[in-house]
Amino acid sequence: MALPVLLLLLALPSRSVQDEELKLNECVCEGMSCGNGDRCQGQQCFASLSINDGAKVYQKGCFQVYEQGKMTCKTPPSPDQAVECCQGYLCNMNITAKLPSSKGQTLQGEAAGYSMETLIIVILAPVVVLVIFSVVAVLIIRRIQKNHMERLNSRDAEYGTIEGLIASNVGDSTLADLLDHSCTSGSGSGLPFLVQRTVARQITLVECVGKGRYGEVWRGQWQGENVAVKIFSSRDEKSWFRETELYNTVLLRHENILGFIASDMTSRNSSTQLWLITHYHEMGSLYDYLQLTTLDTVSCLRIVLSIASGLAHLHIEIFGTQGKPAISHRDLKSKNILVKKNGQCCIADLGLAVMHSQSTNQLDVGNNPRVGTKRYMAPEVLDETIQADCFDSYKRVDIWAFGLVLWEVARRMVSNGIVEDYKPPFYDLVPNDPSFEDMRKVVCVDQQRPNIPNRWFSDPTLTSLAKLMKECWYQNPSARLTALRIKKTLTKIDNSLDKLKADC
């Protein structure tokens, strides 16, 4: 009984599949085998694509025999023939056979052709854009420069026509006349701005007399007179601005401070230059002078006393309408001191100067990223313990540096026929261009000071100078002498020398 039932159950699905296979479907018929009709009936519908003599042939129709259709439909597509099959009413209407291999080749060919065009465009487009951009940039730059020069020329023309300005008769004046006028009619800090610009435009650069990391110094001529023109590099613009600001707002006319004439931002050789025009001193810097010249007692004292006088004038605050705030130099060294024809010196380069006024109790440090010269830095600067909000701290830094300059000068003073070669401070302890760490170790950690030669102690003047410089080098900043005290001490030494000569 169980066996017939089992056979019956196994036979049922077979008949169901057979019924499905025998079911006829109406299909879309397209192609040569369809005759005049566009429909056909079969057990399976198909859509085919074949390549005949290089041409694509599309056909749609039906398989009358299920097994034939089954075999054909399960055959994977070849490069030149493909068939898609389906079952259902007009199911092949919206299907299309595909030739993966043939299509891939066609697409690759198309892609190859397209890639070449794209490659040409990709190469040429940036070049064309770059050329256009460069041309436009050059035109814009030239236009800007032209407009800038036109503005400068128009301003000069305006300045020349304004009545009552000194600029209108500058050509008949000497620098001494102009500076004397500025001292009696204004702040005494320099020429009026319009005169400064006029003077600057009439200067001819003659020769370069010095170069440094922050710019160049030229000897120039104005109305037949020599002037010094310091041309600042673009990275030291803040120093130019600081010196210009300081000279134009503060009474700094002193025989031991470099005389300021004018400051201007001018255009030369299609570039903007920052000029600071001062008195010209043909003897050059104290650094250069000491390398070539030995000193007697009188010339040595004249140099150090004049430097001390200039520093004291900077440090002191003067009250009144012709007053000035207290100023700290912050970069005092032999290269920033110039030698005058009369044997005295004047202090130059105020690009790092700090100002302080007791009336307002304001400390004006400026906005200059430049730092002082590492070789001349005081211990508190090297170990970063300086009280940056206290003006006296900056003055004490100047005193440390003055002591080092005093040592440089004293080495070149002849006594008993003996003199040392010129050397910079700490020449025997640090390299030519010492690092911050080199100086910190020598000055702060080891607490070393420049060597005092034994022969100094056989000369009363050098003995006094050695004592004085040691009092400038105290590790404790507050223990150092003031600039005024140094000036008075040097004056006393100078007077005692004069008295000794008179007695002789």
Swiss-Prot record:
Keywords: ATP-binding, Glycoprotein, Kinase, Magnesium, Manganese, Membrane, Metal-binding, Nucleotide-binding, Receptor, Serine/threonine-protein kinase, Signal, Transferase, Transmembrane, Transmembrane helix
Extracellular side: 17-119
Membrane topology: Single-pass type I membrane protein
Glycosylation sites: N94
Sequence positions that bind ATP: V209, G210, K211, G212, R213, Y214, G215, E216, V217, K230
Cofactor(s) for this UniProt protein: Mg(2+); Mn(2+)
Cited SMART domains: GS, S_TKc
Predominant localisation class: membrane
Record protein name field: Activin receptor type-1
Keyword ATP-binding: yes
Role summary: On ligand binding, forms a receptor complex consisting of two type II and two type I transmembrane serine/threonine kinases. Type II receptors phosphorylate and activate type I receptors which autophosphorylate, then bind and activate SMAD transcriptional regulators. Receptor for activin.
GO molecular function annotation: activin binding; activin receptor activity, type I; ATP binding; growth factor binding; metal ion binding; protein homodimerization activity; protein kinase activity; protein serine/threonine kinase activity
Ranges that cross the membrane: 120-140
A GO cellular-component term linked to this record: plasma membrane
